[in-house]
């Protein structure tokens, strides 16, 4: 089993908490992207980043002096979004870190795909960014099937905890010999299941922590996730989707 998750926009430098253990698999492609970003004017870069002037200025200056070899942070500690707060990797036990290092991958517009302890530097480049590099219209074309093929080399079962923006770069290439299962964390609204961004991010991070704590390796174990008031709903799930509903475990228990 391999687990895929999204990165976060906010990143920090933390070179002391954990040692870096490995280089990103596609560092050559990352160097290409860095060269491309350095060739852009401020206005061109700001358009790609789709952000305000304060963030654009910070990232433009960051790109100008960026070095992919020094002052690196383990990827899992570099990202600072809600998902990572609930995963709380900085307090994982040694055996739990070993679990995520073996099973978890972070998808990235800049690095492609990362193991938790791969060394990274802070950047801003979302997977949906419109780049024009090597005749590719966007990063989905730039990365192509590379990221999926990396996963396929290691597993025939991918658990998708990533957002649509990022899982899209894997889903479009899935072959019959690999099973990809997506976790949905939502609430029932009439006949529909609605995913709320904040709750979904919280649950994805909590799921990674849950899996690391219990060394989960099977689908049946994943279904037992019951944190943050979520519980598995068998009726809404199928072979490619595991649905976890918020606030319904007590309702089912009373039936």
Curated annotation (Swiss-Prot):
Annotated InterPro entries: YaaA
Cystine pairs: none
Gene Ontology CC annotation, any one: cytosol
Pfam families recorded: H2O2_YaaD
One of the GO BP terms on file: response to hydroperoxide
PANTHER family: PEROXIDE STRESS RESISTANCE PROTEIN YAAA, PEROXIDE STRESS RESPONSE PROTEIN YAAA
Record-stated family: Belongs to the UPF0246 family.
NCBIfam families the record matches: PRK02101.1-4
Protein name (record): UPF0246 protein Cphy_1568
